[in-house]
Curated annotation (Swiss-Prot):
Keywords: Glycogen biosynthesis, Glycosyltransferase, Transferase. ADP-alpha-D-glucose binds at residue 15. It comes from Paramagnetospirillum magneticum (strain ATCC 700264 / AMB-1). Belongs to the glycosyltransferase 1 family. Bacterial/plant glycogen synthase subfamily. InterPro entries: Glyco_trans_1, GS/SS, Starch_synth_cat_dom. Pathway: Glycan biosynthesis; glycogen biosynthesis. This is Glycogen synthase. Synthesizes alpha-1,4-glucan chains using ADP-glucose. It comes from the Bacteria.
């Protein structure tokens, strides 16, 4: 089956979060299962270089009147060799900063044009006007940055229209822009409506994907239910409830080629799951690297996360004084909201042997955190799927997490029964407040001191298997249900 997978970030070419991990691993798993997959990505300079994309395979023209022609480049995804197409438009993508923000952390003012071009290209490659002969049977778009792709196909109504799948990785990010962009982006005025991509007097890229795609997926069964409610739907709950029959929750997977403690080149000491001595060596090395006291019996809690309220980092700061009184150490790597960054910096300055804060994301340090930590703190207020708990399982680091989204789908709280049956793989709290979070931490610290019981929990963590094979199989089934014996069925125009 021919699948075009469109995303704004793909690991290891460019990464700001979990979307990149999924966009690198899922296409690779689909290709390994025999599917004919192409990845479409913006032509960020580093991504062009890392993919080896030197060959131009066709012109994309200048659809938005930028005065600069866009070109389609062809490269390969390092590691898996999956073909990658990159939208090379220096006027939009060749700049310092990140994929979405400038070096000062401000959204690029032309993000609407940047990601409209990505969406336009995804749809264009599905039509008879494509610069390449290869035509997808399925167009799989991801998050708001590619949400206009199904809308373009709706507007153009090509003779051979592929099936369209739109995956929500985080519904909080919606890509809302001024309505006066609609004609410039090439859409007829009637599509700017409640039954279209209009959202409270703005053009919403996310709503476009939700409204015009044939099927909607999100990254865990629990999150698929949550986003149909006002508490989690971020204003889209009505549309999602209306399309509930077309909405499926499929858990993400973990890339165990990348996250494998036995072959992890980022570690000081490679170790196999269940190797307590190897785990202890990595803990000691991490404590030394971060300037924490060399205390093998102190529970070392790690955080590998964006630092914002939706990740519950304010709860960590509020509970931190009591956590430190328990004799624990806390190590943080991540970036996010300035007040939270400053809060962790201040805590590290006040307690340098118990708290370490590394502001800014480091993939190698994230691996060493997983290897050296005893517990992973994930107090997220909402968590569509979560990937770090999968990595933690493999590295023997026990999650302490809020029961939401994919965390609720993948964690079994530690209690007498679950501990005795070998099912307990974490410490879960139901209510998102400081008291509930702190109680979960206290339970974890209490059992950490009982090594026989802690070993049971670590063993259960190591036994979890969230590789991409199962998830890729579910996506293949979904694609087949949409295409039948070939060719997309497509959603009919209203």
């Amino acid at each position: 089956m021919r699948v075009l997978f469109a995303s704004s970030e793909v690991f290891p070419l460019v990464k700001t979060g979990g979307l990149a991990d999924v966009s690198g691993a899922l296409p690779a798993a689909l290709a390994a299962a025999g599917e004919d997959v192409r990845i479409l990505l913006p032509g960020y300079p580093d991504a062009i270089k890392a993919s080896g994309a030197k060959k131009a395979v066709g012109s994309l023209g200048d659809p938005f009147g930028l005065g600069a022609e866009a070109t389609l480049l062809s490269g390969k995804l390092p590691g898996s060799g999956v073909p990658v197409w990159l939208v090379d438009c220096p006027a939009l993508f060749e700049r310092a900063g990140g994929p979405y923000q400038d070096p000062q952390g401000r959204d690029w003012p032309d993000n609407a044009l940047r990601f409209a071009l990505l969406s336009w290209t995804a749809a264009h490659l599905c039509t008879e006007n494509s610069p390449v002969k290869w035509r997808p049977q399925v167009l799989h778009a991801n998050d708001w940055q590619t949400g206009l792709a199904p809308a373009y196909l709706h507007a153009w109504s090509p003779a051979q229209r592929p099936a369209t799948v739109f995956t929500i990785h985080n519904i909080a990010y919606q890509g809302q822009f001024p309505r006066d962009l609609v004609p410039r982006l090439g859409f007829p005025p009637e599509m700017y409506a409640m039954d279209g991509f209009e959202y409270y007097d703005t053009l919403s890229f996310l709503k476009s994907g939700l409204f015009y795609s044939d099927r909607i997926t999100t990254v865990s069964p629990r999150y698929a239910k949550e986003i149909q409610t006002p508490a989690f739907g971020c204003g889209m709950e009505g549309l999602l409830a209306h399309r509930a029959a077309d909405l499926t929750g499929i858990l993400n997977g973990a890339d165990y080629e990348v996250w494998n403690p036995a072959a992890d080149t980022h570690l000081d000491h490679a170790f196999t799951p269940g190797d307590a001595a190897g785990k202890a060596c990595n803990k000691a090395a991490l404590q030394a690297e971060l300037g924490l006291s060399q205390a093998p019996d102190a529970p070392l809690m790690v955080i590998v996360s964006r630092l914002n309220d939706h990740k519950g980092m304010d709860l960590v700061l509020a509970a931190l004084p009591n956590i430190l009184k328990m004799g624990a150490q806390v190590a943080v790597v991540g970036t996010g909201d300035r007040p939270l960054e400053d809060g962790f910096r201040a805590a590290a300055a006040a307690h340098p042997t118990q708290v370490a804060a590394r502001i800014g994301y480091s993939e190698p340090l994230a691996h060493r955190m997983m290897a050296g930590g005893d517990m992973l703190l994930m107090p997220s207020r909402f968590e569509p799927c979560g990937l770090t708990q999968f990595y933690a399982f493999r590295y023997g680091t026990v999650p302490v997490a809020h029961a939401t989204g994919g965390l609720a789908d993948t964690l079994v709280d530690t209690g007498y029964d679950t501990l005795m049956t070998g099912k307990a793989n974490g410490f879960v709290f139901e209510h998102s407040n400081v008291g509930a979070f702190q109680w979960a931490v206290e339970r974890a610290v209490g059992l950490y001191a009982k090594k026989d019981q802690w070993t049971r929990i670590v063993k259960a963590c190591n036994a979890q298997d969230f590789g991409w094979g199962r998830s890729a199989g579910l996506y293949r089934d979904l694609y087949k249900s949409l295409t039948g014996n070939g060719g997309g069925k497509g959603k009919k125009k209203a």
